[in-house]
Amino acid sequence: MSRAVYLCGFMGCGKTTVGRVLADLLGTAYADMDAYIEKSEKMSIPQIFSDKGEEYFRDAETRAVEEMGKNGGVIACGGGAMLREKNADLAAENGVVVYIDTPYDICWERIKDDANRPIVAANTKESLGELYEKRKALYTAHSAFMVDGTGSPSQIAAQIAEFIKK
């Protein structure tokens, strides 16, 4: 498999967990975009947000979408990576974009206590729910395949693999 598989979706939808299972299933590499950005920027995501701002972070995401896609494999994107049209276009050029559609309440339960997510700490459940709804339309518009995120990681990965192999 030479083309990249970009997994997108809201924070806590299962991109990281499903991504690892999917990479094993496809016999390819797995990479996490946030970890890639932290390594290339030599600082944590919360540090980037506080020291350099969200716009700088979004620029780093654009570079990551382009650079990571050259290597193929399964890439778990940050929750906001597909917000920029350019990122979605680059991802579609380099591979296939898959949206893991997980209900907000499930995402919230997974992320509500995560100190490494600056956007969670700065918002209420309700305001993040509004953000979820706004982003859902973008994820849907930019993905080649949408998978139900309520199954087990292996079930979700199997559905994605079936789509990829078509």
Where are these regions (language model features)?
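ATP-binding Walker
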Residues: 13
